[in-house]
Each structure stands twice: as structure tokens, then as C-alpha cells.
Design a protein with these regions (language model features):
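ATP-binding/phosphotransfer module of carbohydrate and carboxylate kinases, centering on a glycine-rich
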Residues: 1-12, 21-125
Length: 125
């Protein structure tokens, strides 16, 4: 999935928010955004996590996810953002169509394999 060119970011949507940032294929250390505060004193983990998705329903949660991704874009200026995790498939088609350019969706299995690869990269440093 990671092409190795430019800044590539991965976010996973599930019980919370997971992320990884790669520059030219190299994993950037200490790029943990899930514990950042987003709104009403909530972390991104809480704001986009499964509990909120169940509370809001897919329609409203999808809009929230899109707005968060739109907010990340000017901060990270990615060449490509990959969105995965168990809840990525729950983002509605309407909200997917409104996402910024250079956003791709990947199956949940891809995110799990990428997470294992990230641990391997961290362990070898």
C-alpha cells in the first residue's frame, strides 16, 4: 500500500483512531494523533471511535470523519492518505464523494498487515 514516494499517511477507524505517517517509505516516529484533543475535551480516539459511531449512527458519524480528515489535510499536506480499519467501510458514499483529493480506502486486512509492518520497522530502529 505504501508507495514510498512523498508523504503518505494512514488512518484507521475502529474502536478509536490509529495512524502512521511515512516519508518516502520511512515510518515517522512519534506521530500519534489519537490522543490529541479535537472538541468538547474529547480525543480523536473518543470523537471517531466505535462508541460515538454507534451513538450518532453512520450518517452523522461519516460527516464527522470527513470533517476530521479535511482538518488533517492542511496540517499534514499528504501526497496520499489511506483510510482503513473496521469502520472505514461505514463512511457513507455521500461523504466519500466529498473527501479531499488523494484519499484512498483500503480493506481492514490491509491495515492489520500494515500495523504489523510498522512494529517491525520500529523494532529494527
Amino acid at each position: 500500500m505504501i508507495g514510498g514516494k512523498g508523504l503518505e499517511m494512514i488512518i484507521t477507524l475502529g474502536t478509536g483512531l490509529g495512524n502512521a505517517v511515512f516519508l518516502n517509505g520511512v515510518l515517522a516516529p512519534h506521530a500519534e494523533i489519537s490522543q490529541g484533543l479535537v472538541r468538547w475535551g474529547m480525543t480523536y480516539d473518543d470523537y471517531l471511535g466505535e462508541h460515538e459511531r454507534l451513538r450518532l449512527g453512520d450518517h452523522h458519524w461519516s460527516r464527522r470523519a470527513r470533517r476530521v480528515i479535511e482538518g488533517f489535510e492542511p496540517v499534514y499536506l499528504w501526497d496520499m492518505l489511506y483510510v482503513g480499519g473496521g469502520n472505514a467501510k461505514r463512511i457513507t458514499d455521500t461523504q466519500r464523494a466529498r473527501m479531499p483529493a488523494k484519499v484512498a480506502y483500503v480493506p481492514n486486512e490491509t491495515g492489520m498487515l500494515g500495523g504489523l509492518r510498522a512494529w517491525d520497522l520500529i523494532g529494527s530502529q
